[in-house]
């Protein structure tokens, strides 16, 4: 169905992507893990994943063995992806002292980080690379991965990615319970400073509940893409861009925006023609039934405005002049320009992390980067000469705020000199 911008904004845009009924369930899970530690984790593995886990931690040798079992072409693919991610993240890392000679900022890596790697419907070695590599470039001392247990063990491809990226520990536990374990620490899992990585609604709510106890990257909703297209776009490619997003899960959201209503109708027909032939059809069909939107706009300005209001995780511009949109599309997780920059390349190998804000949160937050694994603090290191130029201002402001001990803290330094060598 094709709808216009006004109807879309009124009826569909602000729908919540999270099920509020899950929040009390997640709270109970987290509290149970806090109180009962490893025993709770083993019970949840049995209850939710039907897997009995005597050992929650995966032996490190298992990672190397998994890597060695992989076909050489898969090892090469993982290594190329890792190399591109590493190179890009090194290029954007905050490393230099910023500021002036007497006021500046310093950066330090976090000590312990936990990474959630989804499992279940698919294996996600790419998530390992798109998170752990960033933490390693930042200089994080200890990186723990949690991922749901499986009857036949964690897939080799995921363990091999952990080996390549340099993970320190892997634990077979998933869901809200794994987030709680990393936040509180258990007999086996270490308490971490920050948790990153995408997951389902249970994972998202666990992060929300535990934020403050531990740092988080974001509270992620279902994956999403918004595309702006014109008659230069290849509709077969656009259809598969839609399918690629929709196959993540039934809640994944896809938006296609165009000034050309006839083109949107052609795309709708193309999607229906190809759909019976694709893999993972049932998941894609469910996503398209409830969360797929073809939106007609009147002009360039409306297209950009709508994209900024949707603020999607992924924005793709497939028009005759995609770079025209570069400074007008502002609030997106990542922006993909042109035919040869499909969103899927960003999922695996481009370089920026594929852990991105969803559900309009790109209007105020950013995708994961190496700098999310650094702390930043200001350093104030004044000489007496500089102090003498600013102390009166500080005293006046302290006085007007009636913070008289603040004022006295400055006053005492105007009457007593301290021998130093900064003058």
Curated annotation (Swiss-Prot):
InterPro entries listed in its UniProt record:
Ald_DH/histidinol_DH, Histidinol_DH_CS, Histidinol_DH_monofunct, Hstdl_DH
Task: Provide the transmembrane region boundaries.
Answer: none
Q: Where does substrate bind?
A: 223, 245, 248, 314, 347, 401, 406
Q: Which GO terms describe its biological process?
A: L-histidine biosynthetic process
Protein task: Catalyzes the sequential NAD-dependent oxidations of L-histidinol to L-histidinaldehyde and then to L-histidine.
HAMAP family tied to this protein: HisD
Q: Tell me what this protein is called.
A: Histidinol dehydrogenase
Q: Which gene encodes it?
A: hisD
């Amino acid at each position: 169905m094709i709808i216009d911008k006004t109807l879309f904004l009124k009826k569909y845009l602000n729908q919540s992507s999270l099920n509020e009924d899950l929040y009390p369930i997640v709270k109970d899970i987290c509290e149970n893990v806090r109180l009962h530690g490893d025993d709770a984790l083993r019970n949840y593995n049995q209850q939710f994943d039907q897997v009995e886990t005597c050992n929650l931690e995966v032996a490190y040798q298992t990672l190397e063995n998994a890597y060695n079992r992989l076909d050489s072409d898969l090892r090469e693919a993982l290594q190329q992806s890792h190399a591109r991610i590493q190179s890009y993240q090194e290029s954007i890392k905050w490393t230099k002292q910023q500021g002036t000679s007497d006021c500046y900022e310093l950066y330090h890596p976090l000590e312990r980080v936990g990474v959630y790697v989804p499992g279940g419907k698919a294996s996600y070695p790419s998530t390992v690379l798109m998170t752990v590599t960033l933490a390693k470039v930042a200089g994080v001392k200890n990186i723990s991965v949690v991922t749901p247990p499986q009857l036949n063990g964690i897939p080799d491809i995921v363990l091999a990615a952990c080996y390549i990226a340099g993970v320190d520990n892997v634990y077979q536990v998933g869901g809200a319970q794994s987030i709680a374990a990393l936040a509180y620490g258990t007999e086996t899992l270490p308490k971490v400073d920050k948790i990153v990585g995408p997951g389902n609604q249970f994972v998202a709510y666990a992060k929300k509940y535990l934020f403050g106890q531990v740092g988080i990257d974001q509270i992620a909703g279902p994956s999403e893409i918004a595309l702006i297209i014109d008659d230069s776009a290849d509709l077969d490619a656009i259809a598969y861009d839609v399918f690629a997003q929709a196959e993540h899960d039934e809640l994944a959201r896809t938006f296609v925006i165009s000034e050309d209503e006839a083109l949107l109708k052609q795309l709708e027909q193309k999607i229906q023609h190809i759909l019976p032939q694709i893999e993972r059809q049932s998941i894609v069909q469910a996503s398209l039934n409830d969360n797929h939107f073809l939106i007609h706009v009147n002009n360039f300005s409306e297209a950009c405005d709508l994209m900024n209001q949707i603020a999607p995780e992924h924005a793709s511009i497939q028009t005759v002049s995609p770079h025209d949109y570069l400074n007008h599309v502002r609030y997106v997780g990542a922006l993909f320009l042109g035919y040869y920059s499909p969103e899927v390349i960003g999922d695996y190998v481009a370089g920026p992390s594929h852990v991105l804000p969803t559900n309009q949160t790109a209007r105020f937050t950013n995708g994961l980067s190496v700098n999310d694994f650094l702390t930043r603090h200001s350093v104030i290191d004044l000489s007496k000469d500089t102090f003498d130029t600013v102390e009166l201002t500080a005293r006046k402001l302290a006085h007007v705020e009636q913070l008289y001990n603040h004022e006295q803290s400055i006053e005492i330094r105007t009457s007593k000199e301290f021998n130093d060598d900064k003058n």
